[in-house]
């Protein structure tokens, strides 16, 4: 509830990822979607797998006491899986559905990333067109939720960034709207001075330069996707 009030009061654009693990041995929704896609692609019955994913989202909806349903979305997803939708489409549903829930919860407009994040026909990312689409779409949009991790080609084919790509989407939105501040909320408490799996209770880094941020990201720090640096540095957000 506190996070909701913070978003409504101070934040204009929110870019969510797919639901992660609820506990250590849990499975991330993205991995569940990939597994469901594999079953569908192999001609196997994937109904139970998709129902389990639906249940995960319903748990979130119920926990937020929302009068909101994803039933029709899952009907469409099942149909698309049956019609051999690609792996990128399957994986992207994690962010898309989570974005719809968050938009309903915050009272923000939902903007599908497929409409504003553009990939070329060869699957490469189109930075220039994306910036134009985002700028034009959001200029008259006071608040919005834009799901991370994916976009689409001009023909509507869904394409994803690499894992952790919601950070990239967030940086693209920040650049497009010339944001004064970009925040990256995650389950990790900032950048740490050492690997917490090796060093017990390492201190966090309070201030970091763009160069240090890039180096830590490329070295494997999972707080921020390495590619996000490029867009943030361009605007010095």
Describe these PLM feature segments.
Residues 1-5, 9-231:
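Nucleotide/pyrophosphate-binding catalytic subdomain
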Residues 231-237:
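A short, hydrophobic C-terminal helix/tail in secreted or cell-surface proteins
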């Amino acid at each position: 509830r506190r996070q909701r009030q913070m978003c409504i009061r101070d934040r204009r654009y929110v870019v969510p990822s797919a639901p992660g693990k609820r506990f250590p041995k849990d499975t991330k929704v993205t991995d569940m979607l990939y597994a469901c896609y594999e079953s569908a692609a192999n001609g196997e019955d994937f109904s139970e797998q998709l129902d389990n994913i639906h249940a995960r989202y319903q748990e979130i909806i119920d926990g937020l006491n929302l009068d909101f349903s994803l039933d029709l979305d899952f009907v469409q997803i099942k149909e698309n899986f049956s019609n051999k939708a690609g792996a990128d489409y399957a994986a992207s549903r994690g962010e898309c559905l989570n974005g719809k829930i968050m938009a309903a919860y915050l009272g923000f407009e939902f903007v599908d990333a497929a409409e504003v994040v553009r990939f070329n026909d060869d699957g490469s990312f189109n930075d220039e067109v994306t910036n134009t689409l985002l700028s034009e779409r959001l200029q008259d949009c006071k608040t919005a939720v834009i799901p991370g991790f994916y976009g689409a080609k001009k023909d509507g084919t869904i394409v994803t960034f690499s894992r952790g790509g919601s950070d990239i989407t967030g940086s693209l939105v920040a650049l497009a709207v010339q944001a004064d501040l970009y925040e990256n909320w995650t389950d990790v408490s900032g950048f740490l001075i050492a690997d917490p799996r090796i060093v017990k209770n390492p201190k966090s880094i309070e201030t970091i330069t763009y160069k240090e941020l890039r180096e830590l990201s490329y070295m494997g720090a999972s707080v921020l996707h390495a590619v996000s640096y490029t867009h943030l540095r361009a605007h010095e957000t």
